């Protein structure tokens, strides 16, 4: 059996702000669970190269913007921002998963 270890990095202060934002109410720590289940990923922008992941966390669809970066230990996901998915993003998720 093969186990993949995904690494995530993010700004801890920004994560706290997102958790306390009444429109979001979720932190970067919690939203990492998107990668544990079916999720949809596409490229959001090329400069800088950023990706969008859409998936379920805490009973709601959420969208996370992230970058794939490297350090001395290898590749990791740098989480940039997150929000509750829009209607358009919900349709994308339904179409592709």
Task: List each language-model region with its residue ranges.
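Ribonuclease/tRNase effector modules and their secretory precursors
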Residues: 1-97
């Amino acid at each position: 059996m093969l186990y993949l270890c995904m690494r995530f990095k993010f700004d801890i202060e920004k994560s706290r702000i997102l958790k306390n934002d009444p429109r979001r109410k979720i932190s970067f720590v919690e939203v990492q669970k998107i990668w544990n289940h079916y999720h949809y990923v596409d490229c959001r922008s090329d400069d800088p190269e950023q990706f969008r992941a859409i998936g379920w966390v805490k009973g709601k669809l959420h969208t996370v913007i992230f970058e794939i970066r490297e350090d001395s230990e290898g590749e990791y996901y740098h989480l940039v921002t997150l929000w509750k998915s829009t209607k358009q993003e919900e349709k994308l998720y339904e179409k592709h998963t």
